[in-house]
Each structure stands twice: as structure tokens, then as C-alpha cells.
């Protein structure tokens, strides 16, 4: 996805989530030239469902981290679209609409043939196919007001956003870089993070369908201790949470496989990444539940000394196209 559109070797990948901000810098878009990485966990409420609730507090935290991360003024920065603020839709327009006018046509269609749950869409798209009558597009839609808040935050820090990507595309890119993918056309990516689970169906790395499952991020369940997150409840509560999510993953896979693919193609590959604690338990639960699927996880990563919980920042850093 390219909400912004290519250039420059240096990479400064910055991922903001409800519970954490992570950063990876590299001389260029590969794992062998990583220079710096770091993270800072956020108290509950500063960012909620991807929206910047306390902008000043987030700004202050980033200002404190900039010297340690060696994130200098005027650096070009890559960011991710918040998962909970993203829609993926298929949409058709008339074949007579010129390619250079497609984005404008999407705004014309909004509220008519393209019904959205918010009024300020920001569109990116890929053309899937076209014939004499129509062009079929795959739309990636975020809220312009939300993305503008992130761009404004970077401006206040004297940083410049030069690319925005989907976390699911970033995760897939990292698995590809690690040579952990096979040739199966359809894959389900499960990103099991502390505050959100993102379940995405991809075809050859292209996100086609996505559902998010919010997880409670509050002081009853989590505490920041010596710069790290710690789970406050018992292990059985954690296991129950994992099992609940696994059943939701199964619902998403079944819906797409039988309602969209009409049962004609099997989704047999699953990629698991995330920053939730007990990733080994998550992988085991998925392996047991989806016994007919090939499960590949971040536990298989080998080519980076950066912790695997940085998976989306690493995948964002690997993005080739920046402005």
C-alpha cells in the first residue's frame, strides 16, 4: 500500500500502537544494515483503537526517545496505518473512467455505490482486473482525519512521513525476506498483539480481506515494570483469551473460504506474528486447532538480531517504495 508514494536508501520505520511505539532504522531496506531499534510502552489511554487520544503525551514520549534512537530532525519516516482504522473493500467503476481519474471517481461514489462508516475517507487502491464494461479495484481505506493526526505529530517532531503501509503487508514482507513462504496463492496472516489481533487474508502478499479483534489493554490486565509489559492475571486467563481468539480466526477463514472463494480454493497456510506474551503457546494452540494447515510463525525467524516482536517495524523497514 502507498498512501504516500519512492526514494532514499535510509530507513526510519516507526510503528505506533495502543500499547507501544517501536522504531527500527537501517542504512537501506534490508536486515543486514540495521543501525538502531527501540521501543517504549504506553500507559493505557494515550492511543485508543489507533486514534491519538493524548497527542501531547505521545509527542513528549517520542521526544524523549529521539536521542536514544538517533532519530534526527528532518529524517524521512515510514509509518503504518492503524489496523483498527483500516477498511479493505472491492469496488467496481465503469471502464470509461481513465486511470488517472480513478481516485476522484471513488470520492464521487462515496455515499452512493460505495457506502463507508465514516465521512472522511483516504483512498489507496490496486486494480484487480478490467474488461470492456468495468474496472475492479481493491480499495484500502483509512480515515483522513486519523492519518492527518499522525502526519501532524511527525511534523511537530521535525520528521517527514514518506511512506504509509499496512501492518499485514509488513508482516508478510518479513516472512518473505526470511524465506519462510511457499507458493500457495492464499495465506491467512494472524498478528497477535497485546491490544489487538489482526486477521488478514492475502493473495501473493496482497491483503484482500481483514478483520480486527480488539483486546482489553488496561491496568487490570497489564502493568509496565522496568520498561516492559507484564501480564497481571493468571496463566489460565491468558490461555482462555488465546482460545477465544483462535475461534475468531476460524470464523474469518471459514467466511472467506466459503462465502468469497465459494469453497473452490483452500486456505492452507497461516503466518503467525505478534508481540503478545507466550507466543510459543499461541503457536501451539493454533497448530493444534488448525491441524490441516501449514503454520509458520515468527519463532522461525533467523536472520535478524532484533526481537521478533518488532515484526511489523522490520517489515516496514524492508519496504522498497518510499517517497
Model-based region annotation:
Residues 1-323:
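Hydrophobic/aromatic-enriched cytosolic interaction surfaces used to assemble or bind macromolecules
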Amino acid at each position: 500500500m502507498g498512501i504516500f508514494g519512492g526514494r532514499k536508501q535510509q530507513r526510519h520505520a516507526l510503528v505506533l500502537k495502543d500499547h507501544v511505539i517501536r522504531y527500527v532504522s537501517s542504512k537501506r531496506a534490508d536486515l543486514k544494515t540495521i543501525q538502531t531499534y527501540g521501543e517504549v510502552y504506553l500507559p493505557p489511554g494515550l492511543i485508543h483503537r489507533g486514534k491519538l487520544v493524548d497527542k501531547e503525551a505521545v509527542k513528549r514520549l517520542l521526544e524523549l526517545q529521539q536521542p536514544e534512537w538517533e532519530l534526527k530532525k528532518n529524517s524521512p519516516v515510514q509509518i503504518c496505518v492503524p489496523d483498527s482504522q483500516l477498511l479493505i473493500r472491492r469496488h467496481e467503476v465503469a471502464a470509461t473512467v481513465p486511470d488517472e481519474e480513478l481516485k476522484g471517481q471513488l470520492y464521487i461514489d462515496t455515499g452512493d455505490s460505495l457506502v463507508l462508516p465514516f465521512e472522511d475517507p483516504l483512498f489507496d487502491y490496486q486494480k484487480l482486473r478490467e474488461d470492456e464494461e468495468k474496472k475492479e479495484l481493491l480499495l484500502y481505506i483509512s480515515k483522513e482525519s486519523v492519518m492527518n493526526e499522525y502526519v501532524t505529530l511527525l511534523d511537530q517532531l521535525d520528521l517527514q512521513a514518506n511512506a504509509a503501509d499496512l501492518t499485514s503487508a509488513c508482516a508478510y514482507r518479513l516472512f518473505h525476506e526470511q524465506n519462510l513462504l511457499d507458493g500457495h496463492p492464499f495465506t491467512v496472516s494472524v498478528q497477535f498483539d497485546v491490544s489487538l489481533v489482526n486477521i488478514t487474508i492475502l493473495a501473493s502478499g496482497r491483503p484482500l480481506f481483514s478483520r480486527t479483534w480488539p483486546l482489553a489493554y488496561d491496568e487490570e490486565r497489564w502493568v509496565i515494570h522496568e520498561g516492559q509489559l507484564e501480564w497481571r492475571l493468571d496463566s489460565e486467563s491468558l490461555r482462555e483469551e488465546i482460545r477465544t481468539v483462535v475461534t475468531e480466526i476460524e470464523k474469518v477463514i471459514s467466511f472467506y473460504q466459503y462465502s468469497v472463494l465459494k469453497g473452490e480454493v483452500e486456505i492452507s497456510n497461516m503466518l503467525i506474528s505478534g508481540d503478545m506474551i507466550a507466543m510459543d503457546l499461541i503457536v501451539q494452540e493454533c497448530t493444534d486447532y488448525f491441524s490441516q494447515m501449514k503454520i509458520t510463525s515468527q519463532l522461525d525467524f533467523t536472520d535478524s538480531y532484533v526481537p521478533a516482536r518488532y515484526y511489523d517495524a522490520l517489515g516496514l523497514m524492508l519496504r522498497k517504495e518510499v517517497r
